């Protein structure tokens, strides 16, 4: 399970060191993809394969499903962390997430998110009240 918030630095080569506590779960490979709110998502390879297969099973005559599958496939990079636990983020991924040297890696239960630190802090400030009032239909089973 991926829990917690960490603030690794992005180096000049676009490498980011993953938190040590997550490296075993990602040892079988990982998939980096564009996510909501101009963040990046890191999935263990096996979990991503399940997600991608589910997405690919959607009706191909549905324009929204087609667009989602296209964006998911085109925006994903498969990697293995190096011996120091670093991954290299592509220029496209760094641009999409507006990443500076100051980054945040945050757990999202079954995947990780990568944010620019300033964007993460803005997001937290903008959404604090939403979290306090999390009673929407999609959350009714858990809150």
From Swiss-Prot:
Keyword line: Cytoplasm, DNA-binding, Repeat, Transcription, Transcription regulation
Keyword Transcription: yes
Transmembrane segments: none
Domain spans labelled SpoVT-AbrB: 5-47, 76-119
GO cellular component terms, semicolon-separated: cytoplasm; nucleoid
GO molecular function, one term: DNA-binding transcription factor activity
Cellular location(s): Cytoplasm, Nucleoid
GO biological process terms, semicolon-separated: negative regulation of DNA-templated transcription initiation
Presence of keyword Metal-binding: no
Superkingdom of origin: Bacteria
Record PANTHER family: TRANSCRIPTIONAL REGULATOR MRAZ
Subunit structure: Forms oligomers.
Name of protein: Transcriptional regulator MraZ
Species this protein is from: Rhodococcus erythropolis (strain PR4 / NBRC 100887)
